[in-house]
Amino acid sequence: MSEFLPFSRPAMGSEELAAVEEVLRSGWITTGPKNQQLEQAFCRLTGNRHAIAVCSATAGMHVALMALGIGPGDEVITPSLTWVSTLNMIALLGATPVMIDVDRDTLMVTPELIEAAITERTRAIVPVHYAGAPADIDAVHALGKRHGIAVIDDAAHAAGTYYRGRHVGESGTAIFSFHAIKNMSCAEGGMIVTDDDALADRMRSLKFHGLGVDAFDRQTHGRAPQAEVLTPGYKYNLADINAAIALVQLDKLAAHNARREQIAQRYLSELADTPFLPLARPAWPHQHAWHLFILRVDRESCGLSRDELMQQLKEQGIGTGLHFRAAHTQKYYRDRFPQLSLPETEWNSERICSIPLFPGMSDGDCDRVIAALRTLAER
């Protein structure tokens, strides 16, 4: 059998190794100059005034919600078809996650579905820019503004995603992920961007013990050695080892996303006559980052279930992923929201499958995936 082909693999090279070595030799391996450089570079990418590096996008979501004052009695609207970390952060703050349905074909939240879920207790909306494509940012943000509700864009899949010529995040506050499978990675990490000065100050403090400054800030700006706690906070800072990797990855992002686009276009072209159903592209002008390539596998039209297809591909040495099982079907949320019915989410959650897509894939790897899927489609 051929070597196992995972559905994703980090695209790391000699430049990342050299960047890590530089940090290790510098003597400053935790939050320091590389974080500062990364934040500045990310602001240039998205066009925001502030970028705040954190140890994960989950940490970023936590401090963003905290900085907005989200707590008991509040409601936060977000899709169920997302990674559970967003729901978990809402729940851990004592607030109520209001899970809504998505468009059946794009898997995006819509302004209509969001507005139908708004109540007098709604404090925030968290739209998900899914698989590398953007939700309808202008419409969602206009809705939030009209109702006086904060919007936090879940841009974990959206490094290099553009909406109407603007990078996702430019319009407000957004959270990106640098997890191992993301378009740019530093193993674990994330970035919050915002143009809200006061919100940025609160998030910076909350991510580092609730202090007004961190150790590097004190050293470089000559501030008092005894930093003051402004509010109880967390230790969500990013180490410079990770930031150095992320800086290199950011430089490679455009090239990596271009390769992802090439692979995705091959899949779209060469699987078009199979019963496996890809996601529809959003109607608004955008540049897709192709974080994931999703197929929907319906037993009635495909002759096998999603789980059976994933097993068949695994037996042929091809990895797949599931992004995501609907959050409201997970035990914790199922027990708390037993009557919740989201038909489009549930239909997709039972059928979605992520097939291999990463910049290090060769043309031969693509051939192998396409051939395996075509064979399964013909059975």
UniProtKB/Swiss-Prot annotation:
EC number(s) from the headed UniProt entry: 2.6.1.87
Modified residues (N6-(pyridoxal phosphate)lysine): K182
Keyword Ribonucleoprotein in record: no
Pathway annotation: Nucleotide-sugar biosynthesis; UDP-4-deoxy-4-formamido-beta-L-arabinose biosynthesis; UDP-4-deoxy-4-formamido-beta-L-arabinose from UDP-alpha-D-glucuronate: step 2/3; Bacterial outer membrane biogenesis; lipopolysaccharide biosynthesis
One Gene Ontology biological process: lipopolysaccharide biosynthetic process
Cellular component, GO annotation: membrane
Pfam families named in the record: DegT_DnrJ_EryC1 (PF01041)
Catalysed transformations (reactions): UDP-4-amino-4-deoxy-beta-L-arabinose + 2-oxoglutarate = UDP-beta-L-threo-pentopyranos-4-ulose + L-glutamate
Keyword tRNA-binding: no
Cofactor dependency: pyridoxal 5'-phosphate
GO molecular function, one term: UDP-4-amino-4-deoxy-L-arabinose aminotransferase
Keyword tags: Aminotransferase, Antibiotic resistance, Lipid A biosynthesis, Lipid biosynthesis, Lipid metabolism, Lipopolysaccharide biosynthesis, Pyridoxal phosphate, Transferase
Protein's job: Catalyzes the conversion of UDP-4-keto-arabinose (UDP-Ara4O) to UDP-4-amino-4-deoxy-L-arabinose (UDP-L-Ara4N). The modified arabinose is attached to lipid A and is required for resistance to polymyxin and cationic antimicrobial peptides.
Family designation: Belongs to the DegT/DnrJ/EryC1 family. ArnB subfamily.
Assembly and oligomerization: Homodimer.
Name under which the protein is recorded: UDP-4-amino-4-deoxy-L-arabinose--oxoglutarate aminotransferase
Organism the protein comes from: Erwinia tasmaniensis (strain DSM 17950 / CFBP 7177 / CIP 109463 / NCPPB 4357 / Et1/99)
Gene: arnB
